[in-house]
């Protein structure tokens, strides 16, 4: 995560399971009033979200932000596509990399930084099934080692 980040609102844990994250970028979000209120309340889901580049702009799809409870008829659509704010050079770099086979733009987390909602966007390459199994075995081995050390210190 970039330096100086604030409170993490939501994380996409599935992205780290399904993809190798090669690079991360910080992007601003273009939101409506009721959307930022719902995000501050922690009512956002990144599980099935993905980003695409269209006409030189980056858009995030399937990011679910629940409707604001105190909102009225001006409440937002929970699944609308939202624009991400990045520098032109970053967009060009992402566009070139995303055209390569096997690469995707995946939202990793949403956090608040200096009062603004930001998204960590990852340039990711898909994992094969055997890669996922290998990662799970490594994770379990680390847990087992930590458990042994913890038990040894108690004695």
From Swiss-Prot:
Mention one GO molecular function.
RNA binding
Pfam families membership: SmpB
Q: Where in or outside the cell is it found?
A: Cytoplasm
Q: Does the keyword Transferase apply?
A: no
Q: Which Gene3D superfamilies match?
A: 2.40.280.10
Task: Share an example GO biological-process annotation for this protein.
Answer: trans-translation
Kindly give the InterPro entries that the UniProt entry links to this protein: SmpB (IPR023620), SsrA-bd_prot (IPR000037), SsrA-bd_prot_CS (IPR020081)
Domain of life where this protein originates: Bacteria
Record's keyword terms, sorted = Cytoplasm, RNA-binding
Q: What is its main location?
A: cytoplasm
Q: Does the keyword Chaperone apply?
A: no
What SUPFAM superfamilies has UniProt attached to this entry?
Small protein B (SmpB)
Q: Which GO terms describe its cellular component?
A: cytosol
* PROSITE patterns named among the record's database cross-references: SSRP
Q: Which residues does UniProt assign to the signal peptide? A: none
The UniProt similarity line reads: Belongs to the SmpB family.
| Protein's job | Required for rescue of stalled ribosomes mediated by trans-translation. Binds to transfer-messenger RNA (tmRNA), required for stable association of tmRNA with ribosomes. tmRNA and SmpB together mimic tRNA shape, replacing the anticodon stem-loop with SmpB. tmRNA is encoded by the ssrA gene; the 2 termini fold to resemble tRNA(Ala) and it encodes a 'tag peptide', a short internal open reading frame. During trans-translation Ala-aminoacylated tmRNA acts like a tRNA, entering the A-site of stalled ribosomes, displacing the stalled mRNA.
NCBIfam families, per the entry: PRK05422.1, smpB
What name goes with this protein? Answer: SsrA-binding protein
- Per the UniProt record, the source organism is Bacillus cereus (strain G9842)
Q: What is the lineage of its organism?
A: Bacteria, Bacillati, Bacillota, Bacilli, Bacillales
The encoding gene: smpB
